[in-house]
């Protein structure tokens, strides 16, 4: 008898086709819908009811039992509190990565086991392969949808219990399968925004939880250009929302966020998408995780590729451990808008090696100080 697989059903097309494919492969399939956010009183941003209705329609069409679970408390404690603390410290976090680590592949897996699951499955565009007795996390075959960047914190035990049926497919193929199966969500828009919280006016949302500290907007030379509403609302390389136009000296070229001076509460801006101060030669990262459970040896210099944000092309680099949980990354070419709080994820060809959280960035002339 084929194993029992519990599929994370979100109401979207990816999880729906995941369940469809597993049924066609002969697995015994159940669905599990997660509700992880309860803070909004009204329905302004609420899509959970529609998502559940879509998941229910798909499961009924497939003849699959759909369970529901509320992980709102776990999400608040393990994901959202960390999200807020990172913004409070002036960094820009990636909650999707933490959500995968703490909710989708920990709390969900534990609950699925209580339902009698042998395996779980998710609609992520990624693959798992075995090499010399260890499991590898591989990129999805659709380069525009590959989600391995968000999955680098997965452990061997989690990979061994997880199926990614969409890893070898392109998004167009997934939508075609959904349409062929008669799913009403075959053309449903991909979810965006904060994991499980969704799309919303981010500035208004963040202000509900963190007090803003307005301050000056200045050029690197110290010229005062205006006022910002709070450093937490801005990220490196950002163009829109600055509220400043051209200057007599600088012309009408757009302004970009170059730095956030936390000590002085100053937003540093400059003109030009490729302003030199937006580029860094390297970074230091911590909170490291290696998919194979080992990673490079202390002192070893590993040449590989890295991404410092989702959908970035692979960037050649060399990495070395400089402490038990700290890593130095030096890029072959300077990188634009490398942002503390985001994750740097490492690859060799299609294989995701692991990654960590960016602590700070440096240029070659300041490397000694950074280390």
Curated annotation (Swiss-Prot):
One of its GO terms (biological process) is tRNA wobble position uridine thiolation. The active site is at 99 (nucleophile), 195 (cysteine persulfide intermediate). Residues 94-96 are annotated as: Interaction with target base in tRNA. One of its GO terms (molecular function) is ATP binding. It holds the Pfam family tRNA_Me_trans_M. The keyword DNA-binding does not apply. The record marks 124, 342 as: Interaction with tRNA. Keywords: ATP-binding, Cytoplasm, Disulfide bond, Nucleotide-binding, RNA-binding, Transferase, tRNA processing, tRNA-binding. Disulfide bonds join 99-195. The keyword Transferase applies. Gene3D superfamilies: Adenine nucleotide alpha hydrolases-like domains, HUPs, Translation factors. Residues 145-147, 309-310 are annotated as: Interaction with tRNA. HAMAP family: tRNA_thiouridyl_MnmA. This is tRNA-specific 2-thiouridylase MnmA. The gene is mnmA.
């Amino acid at each position: 008898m084929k194993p029992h697989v519990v599929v994370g059903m979100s109401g979207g097309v990816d999880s729906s086709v995941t369940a469809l494919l597993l049924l066609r492969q002969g697995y015994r399939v159940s669905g599990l819908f997660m509700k992880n956010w309860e803070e909004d009183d009204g329905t302004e941003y609420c899509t959970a009811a529609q998502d559940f209705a879509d998941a229910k329609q798909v499961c009924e069409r497939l003849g699959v039992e759909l369970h529901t679970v509320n992980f709102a408390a776990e999400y608040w404690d393990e994901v959202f509190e960390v999200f807020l603390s990172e913004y409070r410290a002036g960094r820009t976090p990636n909650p999707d990565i933490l959500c995968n680590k703490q909710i989708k592949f920990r709390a969900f897996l534990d609950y699925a086991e209580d339902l009698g699951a042998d395996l779980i499955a998710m609609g992520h565009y990624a693959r798992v392969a075995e090499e010399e007795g260890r499991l590898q996390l591989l990129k999805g075959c659709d380069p525009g949808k590959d989600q391995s960047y968000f999955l680098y914190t997965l452990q061997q035990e989690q990979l061994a219990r997880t199926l990614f049926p969409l890893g070898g497919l392109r998004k167009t193929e997934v939508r075609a399968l959904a349409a062929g199966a008669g799913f009403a969500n075959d053309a449903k828009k991909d979810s965006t925004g904060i994991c499980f919280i969704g799309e919303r006016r981010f500035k208004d949302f963040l202000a509900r939880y963190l007090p803003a500290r307005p301050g000056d907007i200045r050029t690197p030379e110290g010229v005062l250009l205006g006022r910002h509403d709070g450093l937490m609302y801005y990220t490196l390389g950002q163009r829109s929302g600055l509220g400043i136009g051209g200057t007599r000296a600088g012309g009408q070229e757009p302004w970009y966020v170059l730095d956030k001076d936390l000590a002085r509460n100053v937003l540093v801006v400059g003109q030009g998408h490729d302003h030199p101060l937006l580029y860094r030669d390297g970074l230091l990262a911590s909170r490291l995780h290696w998919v194979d459970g080992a990673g490079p040896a202390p002192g070893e210099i590993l040449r590989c590729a890295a991404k410092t944000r989702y959908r970035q092309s692979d960037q050649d680099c060399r990495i070395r451990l400089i402490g038990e949980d700290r890593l130095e990354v030096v890029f072959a070419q300077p990188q634009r808008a490398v942002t503390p709080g985001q994750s740097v994820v490492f690859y060799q060809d299609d294989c995701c090696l692991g990654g960590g959280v960016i602590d700070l960035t440096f240029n070659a002339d300041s490397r000694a100080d950074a280390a």
